[in-house]
């Protein structure tokens, strides 16, 4: 719609020339990549040129809500109204943390937001899905499972990343009682069915509004290169100092990098993230980690595993970190360092993108990895290694033990020999 085009025009912080860069026609859909011919079919059979068929180019259907609310003001004041809206969301999260976790947690959130989200906190809408992930966590801790699943479903259709939190929520729900397995599975059925129905309804709504942009969102996730702030891009930058030239270029609304080691870097980071996910979920399953710890670990995993790690992605972590991170020790200092480095790289050093500032991003990403390693129950791997080694040793000893038992049963016993010697 024309109103949403105005929104995109004035939201200069989100992406410049959004409509010019992303407005789609049939030819663009055909050239944007195919999903088994789906793109070509959509381009040939769907006409989305009418009103009320506009979706955010990178975000799911519920993102229309926070972007549409400030439309009550004149277009010239949209940016101010949007900033006020996000400020109210931030204050709401502060109050929620103060109510549920205390003033120290709320203060830690406020300090980290002031430093780490200096340029993105009220210019992006990431506070809204981050708030829903916090609400879902608090509902899960109170065992209000159906509402927790629905909060995550709403967050997922605001910005796709909360979908990964379905796994720790499912595990926590399954381990919430000591009832027999059948009763646990039966208790899961209703909340999961309600969540699946909500997701299916929102997905259908997306397809009805504009299947062309919905297809383009999926194609973008699959095709986009490594964004310069991502963890794989840091490995590419390090590889450039080892003889693998790095190429910088723009596209998909971001600055990107590429080199011969880019696929290997993405694979290595993906494997590290997978190990982190397994460790976090196993720790939650065996009750060696709390649900907030596993929640934060999974969120950190998705940030380091992705092709993009924009400055506003730090907002995803901060409400949950306020619940988990103690106010004493080194952990809060490392969090503050990560926030400072994030703001130092954007916006202050953003114009020096090709001037060598990648080292600041490398330090930020390293601090996030250190925080993730500190959060994970790494002793799980030590226990697993000891258990596997014990089984290996037991199997090696078992044949000799069986032979000795057979000899003892076949031959005369020691008492029998002594009786024979007496006679």
Locate each region found by the language model:
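Multi-pass membrane glycosyltransferase architecture that uses lipid-linked
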Residues: 1-219, 264-423
